[in-house]
Protein backbone atom coordinates (compact mmCIF):
# COMPACT_ATOMS: atom_id res chain seq x y z
CA UNK A 1 0.00 0.00 0.00
CA UNK A 2 1.26 3.45 -0.94
CA UNK A 3 1.79 6.03 1.80
CA UNK A 4 2.57 9.75 1.93
CA UNK A 5 6.32 9.11 2.33
CA UNK A 6 6.36 7.02 -0.88
CA UNK A 7 4.56 9.78 -2.78
CA UNK A 8 6.83 12.48 -1.34
CA UNK A 9 9.96 10.55 -2.25
CA UNK A 10 8.68 9.99 -5.78
CA UNK A 11 7.70 13.63 -6.36
CA UNK A 12 11.09 14.76 -5.03
CA UNK A 13 12.79 12.32 -7.41
CA UNK A 14 10.57 13.55 -10.27
CA UNK A 15 11.66 17.13 -9.64
CA UNK A 16 15.28 16.00 -9.58
CA UNK A 17 14.79 14.30 -12.95
CA UNK A 18 12.91 17.35 -14.29
CA UNK A 19 15.90 19.51 -13.42
CA UNK A 20 18.68 17.14 -14.43
CA UNK A 21 17.17 15.45 -17.51
CA UNK A 22 19.54 12.59 -16.80
CA UNK A 23 18.61 9.17 -18.14
CA UNK A 24 19.26 7.47 -14.79
CA UNK A 25 17.12 9.97 -12.85
CA UNK A 26 14.18 9.55 -15.23
CA UNK A 27 14.56 5.78 -15.42
CA UNK A 28 14.53 5.50 -11.61
CA UNK A 29 10.96 6.84 -11.52
CA UNK A 30 9.23 4.16 -13.61
CA UNK A 31 8.88 0.41 -13.77
CA UNK A 32 10.32 -1.26 -16.87
CA UNK A 33 6.80 -1.68 -18.28
CA UNK A 34 5.48 1.63 -16.95
CA UNK A 35 3.11 3.97 -18.76
CA UNK A 36 3.37 7.77 -18.96
CA UNK A 37 0.41 9.77 -20.24
CA UNK A 38 1.41 13.38 -20.92
CA UNK A 39 -2.30 14.22 -20.97
CA UNK A 40 -5.38 12.30 -19.85
CA UNK A 41 -6.51 11.64 -23.44
CA UNK A 42 -3.03 10.89 -24.79
CA UNK A 43 -1.91 7.44 -25.79
CA UNK A 44 0.42 6.11 -23.11
CA UNK A 45 4.13 6.11 -23.71
CA UNK A 46 4.84 2.50 -22.75
CA UNK A 47 8.05 1.16 -21.27
CA UNK A 48 10.83 2.96 -19.47
CA UNK A 49 13.04 3.26 -22.57
CA UNK A 50 10.25 5.02 -24.49
CA UNK A 51 9.44 7.18 -21.45
CA UNK A 52 13.06 8.34 -21.19
CA UNK A 53 13.27 9.09 -24.93
CA UNK A 54 9.99 11.02 -24.95
CA UNK A 55 10.87 12.91 -21.77
CA UNK A 56 14.23 13.98 -23.21
CA UNK A 57 12.60 15.11 -26.46
CA UNK A 58 10.43 17.48 -24.38
CA UNK A 59 13.09 18.46 -21.81
CA UNK A 60 13.12 21.87 -20.18
CA UNK A 61 16.02 23.69 -18.57
CA UNK A 62 16.81 23.05 -14.90
CA UNK A 63 16.04 26.58 -13.76
CA UNK A 64 12.96 27.23 -15.91
CA UNK A 65 10.38 26.51 -13.18
CA UNK A 66 9.40 26.61 -9.57
CA UNK A 67 7.07 23.88 -8.38
CA UNK A 68 4.87 23.43 -5.34
CA UNK A 69 2.66 20.45 -4.62
CA UNK A 70 0.58 18.54 -2.12
CA UNK A 71 -0.91 15.07 -1.87
CA UNK A 72 -4.67 15.19 -2.41
CA UNK A 73 -5.26 11.56 -1.57
CA UNK A 74 -4.10 7.97 -1.66
CA UNK A 75 -6.22 4.93 -2.45
CA UNK A 76 -4.29 1.68 -2.28
CA UNK A 77 -1.46 1.98 -4.81
CA UNK A 78 -2.94 5.10 -6.43
CA UNK A 79 -1.93 8.65 -5.43
CA UNK A 80 -3.32 12.02 -6.45
CA UNK A 81 -1.04 15.06 -6.40
CA UNK A 82 -1.94 18.71 -7.00
CA UNK A 83 0.87 20.91 -8.28
CA UNK A 84 1.56 24.45 -9.35
CA UNK A 85 4.28 25.22 -11.87
CA UNK A 86 5.55 28.74 -12.45
CA UNK A 87 7.85 29.21 -15.44
CA UNK A 88 10.40 32.01 -15.45
CA UNK A 89 8.84 33.33 -18.69
CA UNK A 90 5.55 34.04 -16.89
CA UNK A 91 3.60 30.91 -17.84
CA UNK A 92 1.67 29.52 -14.87
CA UNK A 93 0.09 26.06 -14.71
CA UNK A 94 -2.01 24.02 -12.33
CA UNK A 95 -1.38 20.28 -12.39
CA UNK A 96 -3.10 17.12 -11.32
CA UNK A 97 -1.05 13.95 -11.27
CA UNK A 98 -2.43 10.45 -10.93
CA UNK A 99 0.33 8.00 -10.03
CA UNK A 100 -0.05 4.24 -9.68
CA UNK A 101 2.82 2.82 -7.65
CA UNK A 102 4.54 -0.54 -7.87
CA UNK A 103 5.53 -2.17 -4.56
CA UNK A 104 9.11 -0.84 -4.94
CA UNK A 105 7.96 2.81 -5.03
CA UNK A 106 8.37 3.36 -8.76
CA UNK A 107 5.43 4.42 -10.91
CA UNK A 108 3.77 1.76 -13.02
CA UNK A 109 1.50 4.46 -14.45
CA UNK A 110 1.64 8.25 -14.44
CA UNK A 111 -0.96 10.58 -15.92
CA UNK A 112 -0.71 14.34 -15.79
CA UNK A 113 -3.21 17.09 -16.41
CA UNK A 114 -1.87 20.60 -16.84
CA UNK A 115 -4.00 23.68 -17.22
CA UNK A 116 -2.82 27.22 -17.83
CA UNK A 117 -3.82 29.54 -14.98
CA UNK A 118 -5.83 32.70 -15.68
CA UNK A 119 -3.50 35.65 -16.15
CA UNK A 120 -0.71 33.42 -17.39
CA UNK A 121 1.33 34.34 -20.46
Task: Please describe what each predicted stretch is.
Residues 1-24, 28-32, 121:
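Short, low-complexity N-terminal intrinsically disordered segments enriched in polar/charged residues
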Residues 35-44, 113:
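A short gly/proline-enriched turn/hairpin at secondary-structure junctions
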Residues 1-4, 15, 23-24, 37-41, ...:
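Short, charged low-complexity linear motifs
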Residues 52-121:
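A beta-strand edge to alpha-helix "cap/lid" segment located at domain peripheries
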Residues 42-53:
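Short beta-edge strand/loop motif at the mouth of beta-sheet-based domains
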Residues 27, 38-39, 66-68:
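Short, hydrophobic secondary-structure boundary micro-motifs
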Residues 28-36, 53, 110:
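Short, charge- and proline-biased low-complexity linear segments
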Amino acid sequence: MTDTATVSNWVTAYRTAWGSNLDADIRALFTDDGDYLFGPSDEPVHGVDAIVATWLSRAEGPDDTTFSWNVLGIDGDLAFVQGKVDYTDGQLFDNLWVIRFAPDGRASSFTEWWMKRPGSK
